[in-house]
Amino acid sequence: MKRRLFALALALLLAVSLPVSALVRDWYIDDGDITINATADGKQTVKQGNKDAADDDPTITQRDSSKETSNTITIDADEHTTANVTLDGVNINTDADANRRSETAFRTEGEGDVNIELDGSNTLWSGYSSNAAGLNKGNSGTLTINDEDNNGTLEATGGYGGAGIGGGQHSSASDITITGGTITARGSNGGAGIGGGASDINGPYCNGSNITISGDAQVKAQGGTEHNEYNEGAGAGIGNGGKQGKNEAGKKVPVDGDKVEPDTSGLTEKRETRILRTRRGYGK
């Protein structure tokens, strides 16, 4: 009996003494906002509420993805570091909560790189008054979206003036690479589908540049509305945002890495472009 009690006590002691990262497998977005930090010392930590753990490759999921959550994801990567995360069935819509409409569904920050792996069906919808992209690229390094298992989808929709994937209102976005997954990106009120956000009437275009789509990626990108009561220029499907207060549409940019460059000749009318699946690089 004493041996059994001793063994039980030892097991409990070991469980308590294990680092938090050894006990954490998945992070549930239902439980609150999640922040991932990749620091210059080579460490990556994940914070959610009072939980703070070392985790080099976290998976963020949701217990019931049929229900929208207004909780958000932030990734901050220091210079010369790469932050990694897997999205596995999250359904974030900060516009669905009246108290969270100024929040960004998913944003990246810092001077490092960010890698996102897709599993399952994922939705990122930033609140209307956030003026942000659905997946808001704020880091100055690269943003790469992968789908190694070929089972991931991502639907990203921007808030007012924001791109689907890329810059928020009055912000450019560059160095975006999509190598896999089925991606639908919708800009809002002049934001590009993938690329820059909307700019104001007297400002320069918010550029979307160095955008590469390759591998098994299937992408549908739709720029924000062209005409409404505010006379806003449409965002390109892939490229620059439009100009708000002036009917000037954003310009498309060449997309590197894909065999078939998207046809955006009718962008002003249709505000939509599709990229076909291919395994070969553009021009090869």
Please tell me what each predicted stretch does.
Residues 3-22:
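Sec-dependent N-terminal signal peptides of Gram-positive bacterial secreted proteins and lipoproteins
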